[in-house]
């Protein structure tokens, strides 16, 4: 009796086994490579968008006697929300008095002036590395009869639609183009303030290292002061002269000033400082204080 001749090809079971073995070798290589490529792409987008915001700021300043965007009116203070972000008038939006002074405004309302007056898209204020933040769409909040240039903020919960921290524009130390060119005016989200993706980082984990004046912390402790969105590696920072750079430490301002904290000095920057809260003010003209609005529950 003749025996059947075995085919030289693989059975389907053998094909599956070989495929799984190959994938076991290839996936550990391809997945991290894809993740790294995605991170690089997000970082490039964040830097480009922050640069575009910077150009719009300088254009705005050119139309307003050198003043960078500051919402509200004279004497307006930093508050948790606007009186009415979709109001018909500025007075109604910020709760100004009959002299068009006072009232409260969010940090993001000042950035929103770039949407109103300079045609910057709300998408430009969303960094893909900032989790929990999405592009502002008025329709989501029931506003269907107004254009984005007719509104006053990124909704009643602007922290969910604006990734970037901005120097406090209300009070005695608002920035103008007369400040030093290397003054930090905006950056990735402040790590000491609650974000859409989680609570503020514990400040006790942070200490400046030897790269700062008087720094005694370790490299890991210094990295704990960086923005969360870039795996503690640093943050993109916009300076007054319009350039954007990736700073590996948060104390990249004037006099090694920490851009995310209030300086403990009344005359200079401070690499440590104290974490800000709603209503905080810079300590002096050299103190960059880049903050975000609180997240509305």
Could you describe each region identified by the protein language model?
Residues 2, 6-48:
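Amphipathic alpha-helical segments typified by the pilin-like N-terminal helix
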Residues 42-297:
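Short, well-structured segments within or immediately adjacent to enzyme catalytic domains
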């Amino acid at each position: 009796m003749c025996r059947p001749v075995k085919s030289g090809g693989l059975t389907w079971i053998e094909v599956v086994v070989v495929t799984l073995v190959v994938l076991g070798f290839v996936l550990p290589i391809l997945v991290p490579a894809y993740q790294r490529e995605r991170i690089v792409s997000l970082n490039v987008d964040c830097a480009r968008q922050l640069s575009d915001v910077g150009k719009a700021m300088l254009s705005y300043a050119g139309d307003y006697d050198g003043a960078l965007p500051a919402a509200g009116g004279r004497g307006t203070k930093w508050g948790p929300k606007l009186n009415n972000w979709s109001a018909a008038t500025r007075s109604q939006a910020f709760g100004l008095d009959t002299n068009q002074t006072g009232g409260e405004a969010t940090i993001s309302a000042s950035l929103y002036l770039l949407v109103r007056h300079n045609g910057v898209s709300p998408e430009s204020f969303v960094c893909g590395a900032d989790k929990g933040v999405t592009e502002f769409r008025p329709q989501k909040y029931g506003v269907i009869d107004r254009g984005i240039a007719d509104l006053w903020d990124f909704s009643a919960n602007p922290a969910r639609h604006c990734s970037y921290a901005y120097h406090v524009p209300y009070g005695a130390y608002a920035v103008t183009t007369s400040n030093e060119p290397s003054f930090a005016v905006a950056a990735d989200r402040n790590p000491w303030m609650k974000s859409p993706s989680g609570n503020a980082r514990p400040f006790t984990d942070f200490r400046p290292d030897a790269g700062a004046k008087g720094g005694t912390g370790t490299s890991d402790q210094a990295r704990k002061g960086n923005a969360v969105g870039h795996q503690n590696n640093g943050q993109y920072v916009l300076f007054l002269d319009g350039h954007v750079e990736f700073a590996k430490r948060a104390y990249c301002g004037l006099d090694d000033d920490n851009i995310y904290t209030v300086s403990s000095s009344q005359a200079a920057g401070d690499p440590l400082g104290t974490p800000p809260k709603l209503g905080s003010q810079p300590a002096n003209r050299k103190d960059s204080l880049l903050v975000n609005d609180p997240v509305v529950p």
